[in-house]
């Protein structure tokens, strides 16, 4: 049986980390693509040489031509400009929209059957635009955000409660921005919903509120510390989890930016919701029961996403 082919579009910090993880996990042969000559080739060679140490047999190739992604089973898109201190994800809109157009056209021409995971920010608008530019089925184009945001939520909860992250299930909904909605009632520690943990004295309501706010600002916290870029380890791990569920038909339920067709009362946009990822791509959306407060927060987050979509349409009239 032929090995899977994984095309990583963008050879920056996330792209290089993705290539390393994909090789170590033996997910498939890796094409690391970038427009910068030498960068993908150098990183691919470095990881290939490392494979002789960690003992995994995979092929890695750096490329500057979209023709090299031909026949890819999975494309993970990180191409674009990352955030710098003082920037919001939305500040990246104009330049990264142009990047998504080039990437979408490259995927359409050479890897039309791929499952596409977008990481480029502002995420919800970029994955929506990428799907239109590529013309791929909507269930085959998805955005990585909720897995990362939920992982941050889970880590902060583990830190506060002293419980293993393996026993924490945290969920975030909505857009990948400061208006995201950490789902407190639906997140659990050892099976106990977070409000019950507060009642039992595991953590105070003030501490929980602080964790929720830190989750919303989690990306900015890392940008401020790094000063020259944004997070890359956790985003890469998150995208690999999504790709693995697709390639191995695991049917994992993961929070991702997914195209909605009536779920949560919404149509014709991408926003973060729990979704079953299997061999068919985004196979089934899980709809949480939400109370009035959660509905209001989710609606606010969706309005932010819609605003970004309208801004994209103003820049590129081909988007509808």
Swiss-Prot record:
Its EC number is 1.1.1.37. Keywords: NAD, Oxidoreductase, Tricarboxylic acid cycle. It catalyses: (S)-malate + NAD(+) = oxaloacetate + NADH + H(+). It holds the Pfam family Ldh_1_N. InterPro entries: L-lactate/malate_DH, Lactate/malate_DH_C, Lactate/malate_DH_N, Lactate_DH/Glyco_Ohase_4_C, Malate_DH_type3, NAD(P)-bd_dom_sf. SUPFAM superfamilies: LDH C-terminal domain-like, NAD(P)-binding Rossmann-fold domains. It is an enzyme of class 1 (oxidoreductase). GO terms for molecular function: L-lactate dehydrogenase activity; L-malate dehydrogenase (NAD+) activity. Catalyzes the reversible oxidation of malate to oxaloacetate. HAMAP family: Malate_dehydrog_3. This is Malate dehydrogenase. It comes from Caulobacter vibrioides (strain NA1000 / CB15N).
